[in-house]
Amino acid sequence: VPSSDVTVPDLMANVRITAPVLSIVKGPQTGAAFELEDDVTTIGRDPANGIFLNDMTVSRSHARIIREGLGARIEDLGSLNGTWVDGAIVNAAPLHDGSSVQIGTFTLIYHESTPERIETGE
C-alpha cells in the first residue's frame, strides 16, 4: 500500500454532512419538511415540540427521533394512536432512507444525512 501524506481530516475538509429531513407527504401540512439538526427531535400536537403536527389524531408528545451518527431511530412516547414505520406499529425502530412514518393522519418520509462536497474554487 503506497503511503500518502493525505489524512482523513484532509479528505473531509471539503465535505459537509447535511442533516436528515422528515417530509410530510400526506396530511394537513403536506409539503412541509423538517431538518433534524438536533440530537433529539420531539414530534407532537404541542407547539413546544420540534415538529408540531396540529391535528387531534396526534398526541401532545407523540414520538421522538434520536440521531445516531448518520442514521436515526424513532421512539413512540406512549401515544394514543401509535407510531407506524413502513406499515408496522412500533415502540422504537431504526429509520432508513425512504422510511415511511405514520403519526395520526400524517404520513412522513425520512431522508438520511448525506455527505455533500463543498466547492473550494481551487
Predicted segments — roles?
Residues T30-T107:
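Forkhead-associated
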Residues V1-N54, I66, E116-E122:
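Intrinsically disordered, low-complexity acidic Ser/Thr-rich regulatory segments
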Residues Q102, S113, T120:
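Short Asp/Glu-rich motifs
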